[in-house]
């Protein structure tokens, strides 16, 4: 079996159906004995250029180990699904399991946002304590 990196873009109006699509596509690969090494749902993002007058799409990245036949079946499923705007399948030399730069940046943003929220809550608590002490 070979290793592949797969990216597909879904129509933004179909974003709520992405989890079902991911489940179906990973099922195609795993039923044929394939293995999913990395699966990242990047969410709705800006496109570099308009596709069918759309400026945003829902991005999904997968790194898999699968047979060529199952990857061909997956590409056919992409082709016949109108919600999939674009797809790209690239063969890679090995399994890629670490988080992509996009996922790392998203995790850092979420961590920074949660720490800012925590510090804001702590500031409110200390202000309330100071007010209570002043009374």
From Swiss-Prot:
InterPro entries: Ribosomal_bS6 (IPR000529), Ribosomal_bS6_sf (IPR035980), Ribosomal_S6_plastid/chlpt (IPR020814), Transl_elong_EF1B/ribsomal_bS6 (IPR014717). GO terms for molecular function: small ribosomal subunit rRNA binding; structural constituent of ribosome. It comes from the Bacteria. Keywords: Ribonucleoprotein, Ribosomal protein, RNA-binding, rRNA-binding. Residues 104-121 have a biased composition (Basic and acidic residues). One of its GO terms (biological process) is translation. Coiled coil: none annotated. Residues 124-135 have a biased composition (Acidic residues). Transmembrane segments: none annotated. Residues 96-135 are annotated as: Disordered. Pfam families: Ribosomal_S6. GO terms for cellular component: cytosolic small ribosomal subunit. HAMAP family: Ribosomal_bS6 (MF_00360). Binds together with bS18 to 16S ribosomal RNA. Belongs to the bacterial ribosomal protein bS6 family. This is Small ribosomal subunit protein bS6. It comes from Shewanella loihica (strain ATCC BAA-1088 / PV-4). The lineage of its organism: Bacteria, Pseudomonadati, Pseudomonadota, Gammaproteobacteria, Alteromonadales. The gene is rpsF.
């Amino acid at each position: 079996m070979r290793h592949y990196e797969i990216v597909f873009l879904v129509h933004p109006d179909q974003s709520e159906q992405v989890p079902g699509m991911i489940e179906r596509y990973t099922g195609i690969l795993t039923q044929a004995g394939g293995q999913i090494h990395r699966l990242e749902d990047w969410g709705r993002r800006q496109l570099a250029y308009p596709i069918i007058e759309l400026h945003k799409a829902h991005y999904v990245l997968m790194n898999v180990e699968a047979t060529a036949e199952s990857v061909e079946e997956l590409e056919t499923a992409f082709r016949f699904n109108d919600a999939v705007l674009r797809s790209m399948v690239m063969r890679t030399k090995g399994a890629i399991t670490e988080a992509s730069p996009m996922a790392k940046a998203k995790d850092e943003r979420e961590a920074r946002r949660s720490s800012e929220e925590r510090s804001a809550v702590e500031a409110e608590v200390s202000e309330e304590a100071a007010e209570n002490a002043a009374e």
